[in-house]
Regions:
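Surface-exposed loop and adjacent secondary-structure segments within mature catalytic domains
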Residues: 1-54, 124-128
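Middle-to-C-terminal accessory/interaction subdomains
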Residues: 38-96, 101-242
């Protein structure tokens, strides 16, 4: 198979092979392509063609032609599950919103798998949108610039499945993002590290319930039960119902 790292700007919209390559880093020079191939250099040309063809087909096919193609060439169910998690935790520095922070893999049969990473900008640390806690999960990002998610959601059964996954994450019976259970996990983790917070550097010696100070929604908290500022409660209010 072929593994790629998608760097900032990886919109899955432009099929140009000029955006694809292998990262080259020396002491004096760094070249990082938008689509950074993680396989053998001997396979690069074929991998470029495969990726370019995938991007071309994703953008050019419509209607049943697109539906049939994407069902064959992509693990759509995994992608929808993954995106439900992305949106639920408030991951704005992602593919849909910012063309960023994901890998993808084509298996030996040519099927595409989406692999996100870098979840530091979550749980109330909001930017590039007005409020990552209550942003519409059906219009999370830049549909025109990063078209894959929005195009999938034009297919009724995929949209319904995505909404189901969002609701499953919030459902009390699954013990995932339901506010009481989420807060209990946070408390358990805090208890585990509390005795180690004090350190000989004198830095970061306090546990605070605040998002990163450079975000645009500094009011968010993970503790408490206020619908005005608790991230879990506000996120639940934004989820469309089944």
């Amino acid at each position: 198979g072929n593994l790629w790292k998608a760097n900032w700007g990886a919109s899955l919209k432009d099929p140009s092979i000029n955006n694809m390559g292998i990262e080259d880093v020396t002491l004096t020079y760094t070249n990082t392509p938008i689509y950074d191939y993680k396989g053998s250099k001997s396979n690069l040309a074929a991998a470029k063609t495969q990726l370019s063809d995938f991007i071309t087909n994703v953008n050019s096919k419509t209607g049943d032609d697109f539906k049939n193609y994407i069902a064959q060439k992509m693990d759509v169910n995994l992608f929808l599950k993954t995106y439900a998690v992305n949106v639920t935790v408030g991951m704005w520095d992602d593919y849909w919103s910012n063309s960023n922070n994901y890998y993808f893999y084509f298996d030996a049969a040519g099927k595409f798998y989406f692999i996100p990473y870098d979840y530091d900008n979550t749980l109330g640390t909001s930017l590039l949108m007005a409020d990552s806690g209550i942003q519409d999960p059906l219009n999370w990002g830049k549909n025109a610039d990063n078209p894959l998610v929005a195009k999938l959601l034009t297919i009724p059964e995929y949209k319904a499945q995505y909404i189901k996954y969002l609701n499953d994450l919030m459902d009390k019976k699954y013990d995932l993002f339901y506010v009481d259970y989420a807060q209990q996990r946070i408390q358990n983790w805090q208890n585990m590290i509390a005795s180690y917070v004090s350190n000989d550097t004198g830095e970061d010696m306090e546990i605070k319930d605040v998002p990163a100070n450079w975000g645009n929604c500094g009011f968010y908290k993970l503790r408490g039960n206020s619908s005005a500022d608790n991230f879990f409660i506000r996120k639940a209010s934004s989820i469309p119902k089944n």
